[in-house]
Amino acid sequence: MTRKVILAAMLMAAFAQGTQAQDLSGQRSEKQDVHMIPGKKLDHHGLIVSPTPHLLNVDAANRLDLQKGVKVIDKKGKFADDVKFLTANAKGIRLTIDFGEKLAAKAGVKPVSGAYSLKANAKGIQIVGYDERGAFYGLQTLRQIVNSEMAKGQMPYTTCNDYPDLPNRGVVEGFYGEPWSHQVRLSLIDYYGKNKMNTYLYGPKDDPYHSCPNWRLPYPEKEAKNISELVQACRRNRVDFVWAIHPGQDIKWNEEDYQNLVHKLDLMYDLGVRSFAIFFDDISGEGANPVKQSELLNRLAKEFVKVKGDVTPLVMCPTDYTRLWANPKPTGSLAIFGNTLDPSINVFWTGDVVCSDLTRETLDWVNSRIKRPAYYWWNFPVTDYARHIIMQGPTYGLQTDLTNKDLCGFVSNPMEHGEASKLALYGVADYAWNIANYNPLDNWERGLVDLTPEAHDAYRTFAMHSCDTETGYRRIESWETKSFRIDNFTDAEFNALQKEFEKVKNAPAQMEANCKNALLMKELRPWLTEFGKLGNRGLKTMQLIKEYKAGNDQAFWDGYVNNRMSKEDVAAYEKHKSGTMVLQPFYEQSMDDMASGFFKKLTGKVPAFYKGIGTYATLRTTQSKAMFDNDSTTYYTSGNGQNTGDWIGADLGCVRSVSEVRILQGRNSVDDVDYFDNTVLEYSLDKKEWKALTGELKKQYIINWKTDSPVEARYIRIRKLKSDKRNWAAVRTFEVNPTTPERLSFPVEAGNLQAAMYGFDENPCTSFINEGTLTMGVEKDVKGYTLLLKLAPGKSLVCRQLNAKGKVLATTNIDQSFCKIELVKKAAKLQLDGSAEIFEIIPEK
């Protein structure tokens, strides 16, 4: 499940290919609130045990010397492969490992699966588990203590009495996108065991034998062998391999398909699977019938689970897996399950929305209907709805006063990047084991060291700036970094930010040199590459601020044009983003502010540089720039569902005479659903009193307004009128008074005349590539021109001044990006010949 919200990215691609539009209004309703991370970093004095034990007392003054080895006394012969981190010696320190209910009760071990006690004293080391899994977990704690910085090959006298808070803890592989490789799955299973997670739900969305239409068919030989290997790896790590099947989209509620389902489960049983889940998520039609689902599950529990004898209770995912669209009434599916579903069957729940925090409120709501503690499916750190992000931030948003009476289990739906998901899973394991003592920030700090001990400083720098999705389930990012606007900062703030950009620039090379986890580096590398570039352009921006403040026009403009991101740079960054909350916005805002200030200094005018405004929080971020980038293939998106009264607009920077507005709504103008389907175009001087420019505009992707009687306005907007649509809202283009040849007071000739208008739009942030010759008329009273250019290395531009008859009066070879041209007498035309990027041609009167 990454749930329908996460299908959004895939559906966008479908729309682009002309597929019939689907209404996603109920699928994307995550709040855009961003909360700080609870907890604080602790000093563990060289000893870290994770998950955090319930009781751990260490006497560092008294120790057992393990350097000569240990004598392993494995009472039940189950742990030969689990003690290899120790040196065996028949005359060494005694290590006794045993488990069983009576033995555990005598040792004071809590009677729950996975509980254990660990003691180290003059008699040796004793591990007692409530069950085999508990003894295995005791060995994991022993391994962490022995390998700790504090122990240094010795074992301090220790008393540990520990147990898990939740019976089911782990991972569900339920995301869309590229499935994990077999190698990554095996690596993750080892990670689950080391971190005391006991559940791995196998349900890849792109596994054709898990879902429609091939769920009835057996796995081919190679795939079956791989699953068998995963089962064996899970057994070694005391993890339940839960194979999930997703039959709901085309299941027939008849005996034939019931037997097809049982046959498939039998085939999986023969591969070693002893735990099963039935998913009915993200389906429609008859397969979503909760009565039929309940009947099927109850029959399977009776005729398959109980008959087999060694199969764990079933887990099911309902179609109504979130409060967002679940029917709350007694006739709803959840209430039906509560009244009819076998009590042994656990029921998944994702919370109030698809990607949401774990709270008592959401559990109380669902538990009162399903009449059992819910099994929480947490859609974090999954990113298949934001695949340009690799989530490396802390694991938080989890209420810490819950118990197993509130939820029966907790599983994370990770990213398609399995190794990179481990940082979040480190937190998932810690939380599910010891809820009350979960410290998200400290857990994250520990996880960084656990994953990359030899490169954790560089990894920390990257991870801190790679946390937020930009949309949907928002996460805090860059919380230690303070940015500023170019006209409001102190020397200390400047120096601190410059130092951070230096760390960002260097982090990728440090990771490459020191990180020994090849699988992790393979996943992170595309993001690290872009991260290093971000650090470099951030440092250049800091230097530019100095040049800007010093008033060095030539040095500033040269630095500015060389620090702008090319289309290729933007495309690469958009695919692998980081620093989206602080670092990249600082770069973009600073570059824009300096360009605008520079233009005003040269002209005395406020540039025609517009900014997004409106009811959506994302309009106040750099995301809104997509409306003003002169590119109809990019778009701003609200990130929130629309409501009546919502609006999207432009701040024109100053009061202007407005005679034309052109807006392209939606992500396309054909069949997109993300637009105001009933709207009105309005203007204002003060953003308080608004006046209409149009009447109701219904189902219009393209809005064109033009008049011969301009209005005076500082703000222009489209406002949503009453309609049932609750989708996000998207805008590709928001043009006010677009520069056209007809609007200019002088003639222009160019190979691409429309593109050439960007050289006269009074916006220094726009540009066009001149290839060949551009000729423009000289206005009366103009004494010269300032040219804001970008020249390719080793290239120059020829500027010719012509009289009215076309005779050349003067020729200038331009080899600098910032250039002033003084007009000679009788100059009637200016001609630029050559290849250059032209930002603005500014007349001087």
Where are these regions (language model features)?
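Feature activates predominantly on carbohydrate-active enzymes
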Residues: 71-73, 77-78, 110-264, 270-274
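Substrate-binding groove of N-acetylhexosamine-processing glycoside hydrolases
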Residues: 49-51, 299-327, 333-611, 713, ...
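Acidic, contiguous N-terminal accessory segments
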Residues: 2, 22-122, 151-160
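Disordered, acidic Ser/Thr/Pro-rich linker "stalks" and the adjacent N-terminal cap
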Residues: 599-658, 664-678, 687, 696-699, ...
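Short beta-strand-plus-loop segments that form exposed binding edges in beta-rich domains
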Residues: 718-726, 831-837
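Sec-dependent N-terminal signal peptides
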Residues: 5-13
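Active-site groove signature of glycoside hydrolases
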Residues: 264-290, 312-321
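C-terminal segment of classical bacterial N-terminal signal peptides
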Residues: 14-20
